[in-house]
Amino acid sequence: MKKIILLMFSVLCVNSFSYVERSEQVGNRGLELIRESNINQNMGLSKESGSTQIIDAYGGNGKFSKTKGLMIGTTSNFVAYPNITAGVTVAYDKYKYKPDNSDYWGRNYDVNTYFSYKLDKNLFTLGFGYSQSRHVEKRGYIGNLEFGRFLTGNTYLYTGFEGQNRNYRNSEDLKFINYKVGVLRQDTWKKFKFLNGIEFNMDNKKYDREDRGRGNITFVSRASYYIYDDLLFDVQYRGTKNSKFYNNVVGLGFTHYF
């Protein structure tokens, strides 16, 4: 039954008609998956293998583009080294660039990998990513480094930075670093699980191409319902406030523990 539910959802996701600000969802969701996996260990919610799988369909509306997408991801502990967690996410997006005012939908493909090491109450996370876009002929390379500390078993405070190098075929490349600090908390109540977080982040320079401020406040709220003891249905909202715009993301998905 669980396999049938996941298969039906994945088919529906491909034809989703909702919209999203792709770059904010893809990178943040993977990092949250690593953080959440470590919080689950602290709270005793992980299953025997310590593995987590997700499938998400997400949608929203940003200032510069409308997109619709699907993401799958997984994390797992190393059997011999339970304090080490590795994860990977794969995302496919279709996006429509608003300033063009056309009906053309471009496509974007993303792969991100993450590794974390937990030492007592401290967590170190390293991430690498690759992104390719067909419409604007862009290749992106992403690196993440994060350090955090568990204030309690279910509350995680972190800081770090993300570097991006975007290579465009017919225009100038774009390189920047984004610095961040945030907090994430997870709670449970009966058959529900709640994840809430807020993050402050700032780029090291102002984009010349985009009408946006350097600083952002991003918050995420996810409510999950236990269909089975190892399968959850997720509803998510993500918002990003910039001095010149507000982007929002809505997502539906499933999480599976084993």
Predicted regions and their residues:
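Transmembrane beta-barrel domains of bacterial outer-membrane proteins
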Residues: 19-257
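Classical Sec-dependent N-terminal signal peptides that target proteins to the secretory pathway
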Residues: 1-21
